[in-house]
Amino acid sequence: MADEIRTGTTPENTTDTTDGKAADATATTATSVTSSPSRRSVLGWGGAGLALGAVAAGGTAAALRTGDDAQPAAAAGDAMAFYGPHQAGIATPVQDRLHFAAFDVTTSDRAALIKVLQEWTAAAARMTAGHEVGSGAVGENDQLPPDDTGEALGLKPSRLTLTFGVGPGLFEKDGKDRFGLKSRRPQALVDLPGFPGDNLDAARSGGDLCVQACADDPQVAVHAIRNLARIGMGKVAIRWSQLGFGKTSSTTPDAQTPRNMMGFKDGTRNISGTDQAALDKHVWVSEKDGAGWMTGGSYLVARRIRMHIETWDRTSLQEQEDIFGRDKAEGAPVGKQKERDEPVLKAMKPDSHVRLAHPDSNSGATILRRGYSFTDGTDGLGRLDAGLFFIAYQRDVRDAFIPLQTNLARNDALNEYIQHVGSAIFAVPPGVRDSGDWWGKALFA
């Protein structure tokens, strides 16, 4: 049963054209893995169970194997490649839904932690390819808990990506070097400073490890985090998590720019996932940056930004546009006609968000944004708990997010309508190269 695949898939390269998704989906073809069959376990034929153990690949049957010596073959055209020089979920096309989880490592046993990371990697390779974890949701022994929780049965891969990172607490926590990694902490993995206006909730901040699950189907993303948490039970525990929807930035330039919960287009000038020069300059860690195990990786900053929705909704349109420095309908900068027209910063108010966030206002500081909107019900006063779950990737936070956020926190007119309530930083290692590699292997070498 381990190699059974779930059904419910669409023909390969099928895209959703709603709200500009088609461009992002089409862009996956360079990095996606394709194969012909559907992905649910095939049961039947006179009451007997039939496991689909091979698929046609280029006219040749290729057996699906579960061991460490084989990458699970993709079960549909919208499965993203798992192996590569960089982790997927950074520069790859942005999906519609997010489940982000930060974990505390509860064991002090180095070998036990390594085993969790190895099992996580194997499970991630299978789930991103559209397969069940281990022996599946209806495993071979019905007297034991199944290896897969089962809520993704019948769902297509939905371009699932799983992006793994390590936080400062993995290297030293409460003065203890639990895993002998203190000397391996990259200089760029700094503790973020306090910024003016921060009101951080410790329960929604920090973490020793993180996994960012992105997919076009929220249930696929939730299934991935749930199964990783189950695998790590007793060794790691979820510290906090966040669901997100309505991607607020795109890495695909020809995709329609998404809107945030304030109704404005968000991410117009984001780094393109196909601009290799910009990615090398601003996103990917190079060998000369130190910490060799991070070469090809990036640094992730996550910020939970709550919006004062009710106050914003009572603000005039003119004031809203002045605050952002763009018009609300088209997204054009002040004095321009089109969204992607080059902004004239001096034409904007000195405290406008676009002006203050522009690289020219921050000594060239540039980040790759990959955030999502969120709504988490209401607070005790009946106000909507909603906003932006901001995610940024960069080569070095000391040259990117920190100076950028310092400028915004001090001067941005938008601060009257938002508050940062959660924060975390993680070092995101390079991609898993092959089936013998695993998340964090070079760190523990």
List each language-model region with its residue ranges:
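N-terminal secretory signal peptides
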Residues: 1-37
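Long, histidine/aromatic-enriched segments associated with O2/redox biology
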Residues: 3, 41-62, 66-445
